[in-house]
Amino acid sequence: MNNTRKKTLAIVLRRTDFGEADRIINLLTPGGKVSAMARGVRKPKSKLAGGIEFFALNEVVLIEGKSEMRTLSSARMREFFGEILKDFERTEFAYQAIKTVSWLCEQIESDDFFEILLTVFRSLNNFEIDLSLTKKWFNLKIAEFSGDEINLESDKNGKPLQADLTYNFDFYDKVFVEDSEGDFNANHIKFLRLMLSSQPQIISK
């Protein structure tokens, strides 16, 4: 059977040295998580090295054979989010997001993880977007896909959330509880809905 070449966008999740000059690269693509062997990538003049950097959107060509391990045929960087590296907290959270998404890809099959991680990188790269906003957005999106999402439609008793009422939040059941002296009102709920339906770049404006 002939090997198949496939061009795709990819984000590097992990790089592991293999042998004297190779690396095994874990990539997140729009179609999911894949592993590829980058042969000779650690050699000084390797043409692959520039296309497998962390915090970047890369365009790669993968050769698919009989095994699950692909071979990286070519790689070039499309977009580099280098501003992230200028701030320790943003860098730390970017690595945390990579680790979280990589783990979830093993548990849940979804094409959305690629766009989620790419959005996180673009948001962290823009210092006009507050770091806390990006963190909240990411955590809400991850909770949505891991079955731990917040109920933003009805309260604990199944009644639709009302604009003229206040609520407290049940962290165990991830649901709002009606309370006349509650800490959460319609504005808080509206903001959470906006977070789930939009992106940090838009919310921050």
PLM-predicted stretches and their roles:
Residues 1-24, 28-205:
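Non-catalytic alpha-helical scaffolds and adjoining flexible linkers that form interface surfaces
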